[in-house]
């Protein structure tokens, strides 16, 4: 059985290493601002779908979460602020790809 707590903590870590700060978490209805990693993970795990929002240099990205997918597919999509620089978006995408590669390897 997949430990989604570990999966989401890992995703947050990969984004933080890329310089993105966790700024909010949503359970699909309500949002908590400036959560700790534990608060964010607990909040999102309280539902089947949620999101984690990050910021870097004033630009935001949101990772959409579905609980129940394979670990590497838990983050199923991204949204971003429209004026985000290509370099910043690539840094987030690269972190997401590295995270997926890690979980794909662990699931193999």
What do the predicted segments below correspond to?
Residues 1-46:
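Negatively charged, low-complexity tracts enriched in Asp/Glu with abundant Ser/Thr
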Residues 2, 24-27, 39, 54, ...:
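Intrinsic disorder/low-complexity signature
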Residues 12, 89-93, 97-107:
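Residue-level detector of alpha-helical secondary structure
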Residues 15-18, 24, 58, 82, ...:
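Prokaryotic Sec-type signal peptides and long signal-anchor helices
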Residues 19, 26, 35, 41, ...:
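Intrinsic disorder/low-complexity segments
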Residues 46-92:
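Intrinsically disordered, low-complexity regulatory segments enriched in Ser/Thr/Pro
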């Amino acid at each position: 059985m997949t430990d989604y707590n570990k999966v989401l903590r890992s995703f947050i870590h990969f984004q933080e290493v890329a310089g993105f700060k966790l700024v909010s978490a949503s359970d699909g209805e309500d949002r908590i601002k400036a959560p700790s990693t534990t608060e964010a993970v607990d909040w999102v795990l309280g539902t089947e779908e949620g999101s984690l929002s990050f910021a870097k240099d004033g630009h935001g990205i949101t990772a959409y979460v579905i609980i129940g997918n394979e670990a590497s597919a838990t983050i199923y999509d991204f949204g971003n602020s429209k004026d985000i620089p290509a370099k910043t978006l690539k840094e987030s995408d690269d972190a997401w790809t590295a995270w997926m590669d890690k979980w794909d390897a662990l699931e193999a």
